[in-house]
Amino acid sequence: MKKNYYALAYYYLTRVDNPQLEIALHKELFKDLDVSCRIYISEQGINGQFSGYQPDAEHYMNWLRQRPGFSNVKFKIHHIEENIFPRVTVKYRKELVALGCDVDLTTQGKHISPKEWHEKLKENRCLVLDVRNNYEWKIGHFENAVLPDIQTFREFPEYAERLSKEHDPATTPVMMYCTGGIRCELYSSLLLEKGFKEVYQLDGGVIAYGQAVGTGKWRGKLFVFDDRLAVPIDETDTDVAPIAQCSHCGVGCDTYYNCANTDCNNLFICCEDCIDSTKGCCSQECSQAPRIRAFSPSRGNKPFRRMHLCEQVECEQVEKKASSCCCSCSH
């Protein structure tokens, strides 16, 4: 397939006086475009993940940069074959990154470019801190990075407190990174509040590093919050050796699935052989659960985010057997 679509990752912290207006304008614009997205807007700014047919994506980027306050938005672009989100989602979220605490965005770490980051890694002088969730860094991270065992963004403030006790903030330089950069905008401020004097953040995140440097000091793949789930950071180097293992047999693997037990639905890493033999379940216990989603190898590892998606798949399967479907879900 030709890669006629763009995947866009972007954020911009700026004062937005009327977030609801920006949301409404986004939704109106997208009505006639071949796009899908997950975009959050608040008084703090915008945080977006977007996919679209190339001309429509170009139109959106130009349109957003013409909106008051958004002229300096930087988009990180990947070439893809199709839309990677299930629908258009544009909504208000008070916290662009759900930390659960107030953060002083006027004090942040020093932004360094991907190439500066690459050179600084060679010095081996700083504590390299991965501020993503554990299921993200499990399949890919920088060499020798500190990998916090956290499962949600809200756990980072507590981790920052522990870090300040494990390392002397006055003498420990920190280099932090995340997927696209927005988490570091907030997390670097937290570390500065904890007394760390020298805090650097990778400008544009791992995505920008891959585009500017290539694989470099990165190992494995990058977890992304869309239908792809895992991608090489360098589009020209797709033969990436896995650093994770199948949760069932231990073979090298970096493919995530949602457990077919709809009451579990947890992400887990699994190889092709085991996902087939376990019918898509993460454990023996889940394979005996009362509500198990029919596993379809042809669907691949496309994520299930909500129960209604399970119901939709069931309806699609019924449609193949009958000329009509009487269910209430949309197709």
From Swiss-Prot:
* EC assignment: 1.14.-.-
What family does the Swiss-Prot or TrEMBL record give for this protein?
Belongs to the TrhO family.
Q: What is this protein called?
A: tRNA uridine(34) hydroxylase
Q: What class of enzyme is it?
A: oxidoreductase
Keywords recorded for this protein, A-Z: Oxidoreductase, tRNA processing
Listed as disulfide-bonded, the cysteine pairs are none
What is the reaction catalyzed?
uridine(34) in tRNA + AH2 + O2 = 5-hydroxyuridine(34) in tRNA + A + H2O
Is the keyword Oxidoreductase assigned to this protein?
yes
Extract the Pfam families matched here.
Rhodanese, Rhodanese_C, UPF0176_N
